[in-house]
Structures are given as structure tokens and as C-alpha cells.
């Protein structure tokens, strides 16, 4: 996590502004191909293709935000630091890719055998307050109580 607390612009407001971006229509045209690439990557167990596609999509999502009217800048210096670190790790041979939703925090995916090295590297970055580890779930589960 590079930032804790509410975003400067809510996701709802960001969605409303997305259509003001001159790149919005083109992004919509690209989505079917991207979905196909994600599906094929999952079916083929091609982690590198999956990672590259979701990273591409995240960058385009933020391109739309940054080019909306008025522009939305979710990224922080910490976001850029993590994005660069992930790219460097990949160049060093660690298979990791980044993705982001609307906000400053970067989500990083990797294979289980790379997790410890990835977490060590991310935790060493000055802008990273802490790392939340996640894993693949066993599937949906009905709960008797709400989580909150």
C-alpha cells in the first residue's frame, strides 16, 4: 500500500468523467480483444500473456482518467515507484506484472514461487507502507454474517 484513505476522486465520479476523454471510444473498441486475450491466457495457463494484458489494461484505464476533463490523477510518486520496480523485477527474470484500479495502490501478480522475492523487494521501497498478500480462493462462500 502506498496510500491509505479515500481517493481524491471517487470511482463513481471517475466513471462519469471517462466519456470526456478523447481516448474513451478507442478503449471500448479494444476491450473485446483484451477479454479474448485474457480468456486464452487463462485457458492456456500462459501467465506472461495474462500479466502483460492486465498491465496494458490498467495503464489504459489511467490514461482515460488522466485525459478526462477535468483530468484525474490517481497515481502518486509511490505508484510510479512500484510500477518501475515491477518492470525492473521482470527484466531481472522474476515473472511479475502490475495492475491498478482507480486509486494510487498497485496490485502485483506473480506465481507462488516468486511471491517471497517479490514481497521482499516491494517492502524495501521507501513509498510502500505495507504489502497485502492475497491468494486464489477456493470459490464463493455464503456467509451468515456480513464481513464488516
Set out the residue ranges of the language-model regions.
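C-terminal nucleotide
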Residues: 1-148
Amino acid at each position: 500500500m502506498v496510500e491509505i484513505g479515500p481517493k481524491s476522486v471517487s470511482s463513481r465520479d471517475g466513471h462519469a468523467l471517462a466519456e470526456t476523454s478523447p481516448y474513451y471510444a478507442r478503449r471500448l473498441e479494444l476491450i473485446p480483444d483484451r477479454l479474448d486475450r485474457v480468456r486464452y491466457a487463462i485457458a492456456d495457463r500462459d501467465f506472461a500473456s495474462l500479466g502483460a494484458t492486465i498491465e496494458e489494461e490498467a495503464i489504459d484505464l489511467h490514461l482515460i482518467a488522466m485525459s478526462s476533463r477535468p483530468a484525474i490523477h490517481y497515481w502518486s510518486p509511490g505508484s510510479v515507484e512500484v510500477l518501475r520496480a515491477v518492470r525492473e523485477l521482470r527484466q531481472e527474470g522474476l515473472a511479475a506484472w502490475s495492475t491498478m484500479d482507480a486509486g494510487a495502490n498497485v496490485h502485483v501478480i506473480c506465481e507462488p514461487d516468486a511471491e517471497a522475492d517479490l514481497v521482499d523487494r516491494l517492502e524495501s521501497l521507501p513509498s510502500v507502507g505495507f504489502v497485502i498478500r492475497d491468494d486464489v480462493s477456493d470459490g464463493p462462500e455464503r456467509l451468515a454474517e456480513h464481513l464488516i
